[in-house]
């Protein structure tokens, strides 16, 4: 309300075209843009292997992708904005969510959604440590969290779910939804990423949710092999396909292009993510920081 929300502040001085766009495309699903990118899997594989053998560091492909996202946002904060009630807001955090199995050995034990906040000065190792800690916390037996209790509660009475969801939508529309609710739900993050390759599925372009304010969805797919010509010789090259879905209303095409160019650069040269950025750019009146993460227990390979 009055330009402030628990998760952001309304942007002032918007370009007229950007300002009218949410009125032309009022719903997030109206403004979805679907992109495809194939990362060089051989580069990523060699980098992960070197990290393990030379430094004893355990790094995953997903962690590299998330670290690339965080670093690209640190120089292009415009892509981290979101639209609510046809108004443009600067997000006051850099966050990501993804779904994991509570027990990878037993799919019947259900899933858990992991939601993590990052600092824009995070290195690849910081991102890895935050992700490992969050995954470990969600894979141990623990009482139901706030979100699970809330969902179970609203289904206790017939018809209550419809009323409760409508009420939350109304509160969210005017920026007065409780911060504890936004923190618990995975629909209030900058990026949602899914590794469907772990399910033996090809890459997907996942839809954006009209609920909440997720502005980007990334789907990691199964390895692909394609013929390429290098130095006059043809060979089969390995690629990691990524399906990317974005909300075109949050910033200009030029900002998105610069952001995606940075992502491609970091996926081609992941070693650039090992050190903090030289400079961090915050959006309009939205500077934020997160404490340094603790070292993940499983991050270092045992000697």
Question: PLM features: residue spans?
Answer:
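C-terminal catalytic/motor cores of large multi-domain enzyme assemblies
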Residues: 1-303
């Amino acid at each position: 309300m009055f330009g402030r929300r628990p998760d952001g502040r309304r942007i002032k001085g918007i370009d007229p075209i950007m300002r009218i766009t949410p009125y032309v495309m009022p719903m997030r699903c109206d403004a979805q843009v679907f992109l495809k990118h194939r990362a060089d899997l051989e580069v990523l594989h060699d980098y992960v292997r070197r990290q393990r053998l030379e430094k004893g560091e355990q790094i995953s492909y997903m962690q590299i992708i998330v670290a690339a996202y965080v670093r690209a946002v640190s120089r292009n904060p415009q892509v981290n904005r979101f639209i609510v009630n046809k108004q443009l807001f600067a997000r006051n955090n850099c966050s990501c969510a993804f779904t994991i199995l509570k027990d990878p050995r037993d799919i019947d034990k259900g899933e858990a959604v992991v939601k993590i906040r990052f600092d824009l000065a995070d290195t690849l190792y910081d991102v890895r440590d935050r992700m490992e800690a969050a995954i470990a916390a969600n894979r141990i037996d623990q009482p139901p969290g706030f979100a699970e209790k809330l969902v179970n509660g609203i289904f206790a009475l017939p018809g209550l779910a419809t009323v409760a969801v409508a009420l939350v939508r109304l509160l969210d529309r005017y920026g007065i939804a409780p911060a504890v609710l936004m923190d618990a739900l995975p629909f209030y993050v900058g990026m949602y990423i899914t590794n469907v390759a772990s399910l033996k599925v090809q890459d997907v372009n996942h839809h954006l949710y009209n609920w909440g304010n997720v502005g980007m969805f990334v789907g990691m797919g199964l390895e692909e092999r394609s013929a390429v010509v290098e130095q006059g010789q043809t060979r089969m090259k390995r690629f990691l396909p990524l399906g990317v879905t974005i909300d075109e209303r949050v910033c200009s095409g030029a900002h998105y292009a610069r952001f995606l160019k940075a992502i491609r650069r970091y996926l081609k040269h992941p070693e650039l993510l090992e050190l903090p950025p030289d400079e961090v750019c915050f959006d309009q009146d939205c500077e934020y920081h997160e404490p340094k993460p603790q070292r993940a227990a499983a991050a270092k390979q045992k000697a």
